[in-house]
Regions:
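Short beta->alpha connector loops
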Residues: 11, 123-127
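A cross-domain feature marking catalytic cores of carbohydrate-active enzymes
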Residues: 65, 123, 143-147
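Short loop/helix-cap segments at secondary-structure boundaries that form the rim of catalytic
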Residues: 39-46, 132-136
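Short acidic/polar active-site loop segments enriched in Thr and Asp
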Residues: 118-119
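Metal-coordinating catalytic core of metallo-dependent amide/deamination hydrolases
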Residues: 129-178
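Active-site gating loops and adjacent loop-to-helix segments of metal-dependent hydrolytic enzymes
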Residues: 71-103, 110, 142-163
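N-terminal metal-binding scaffold of metallo-dependent hydrolase/deaminase domains
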Residues: 1-44
Length: 178
């Protein structure tokens, strides 16, 4: 696969010096960044070149997300937290199914990618649906299966069972592309 060079006016390499580079070249080979720096220092390039507007920087990370809830956006706006949770969100979430979570995650992933977010840490139900949607979208995913039931009188043995299920989930999905 050919290396594609992207040229931009500015770039933020996120190095230890907190640099802001001008006239930046970014080389991508096989879907991975192969080189980034000032264009004047770039290696010889004979492949396709794309001129970009704006700033080149690493993708952002959403460190706390419940993306399938995009389907519930606007429900109960303006209510106090506990009223919103108990009267609006939890009843609606109780009616959701894996396909709802799949479509909600697809929508959430599309919105994040359009905003420059390339990784998300998700905490939600129907974990397999979230994995599927994330793989389809090409967004990186860290997922923590829900354990909220532990806060609602769940027995110790049931909590241990859920933790075991979480460990099994991790074994199944950790680095699914490798």
């Amino acid at each position: 696969m050919a290396t594609t060079r992207y040229l931009a006016r500015y770039g933020v390499p996120c190095d230890s010096a907190f640099s802001l580079l001008e006239e930046v070249a970014l080389d991508v080979a096989d879907g991975r960044i192969a080189w980034v720096g000032e264009e004047s220092a770039a290696p010889v390039h004979e492949g396709p070149t794309v001129k970009l507007n704006g700033l080149v920087m690493p993708g952002l990370i959403n460190a706390h997300a419940h993306s399938p809830m995009t389907l519930l956006r606007g429900a109960g706006d303006g209510l106090p937290l506990m009223e919103w949770l108990t009267q609006v969100m939890w009843p609606r979430e109780g009616q959701m199914n894996p396909e709802d979570a799949l479509w909600g995650m697809r929508l959430g992933a599309a919105e994040m990618l359009l905003a420059g977010v390339t990784a998300s840490c998700e905490m939600y139900l129907f974990e397999e649906s979230l994995v599927q949607a994330s793989l389809e979208a090409g967004i990186r995913l860290a997922i923590t299966p829900g354990i909220i039931s532990a806060l609602h009188g769940e027995t110790y043995n049931a909590s241990k069972s859920r933790l075991s299920a979480i460990a099994d989930f991790h074994s199944q999905y950790h680095n699914p592309e490798s």
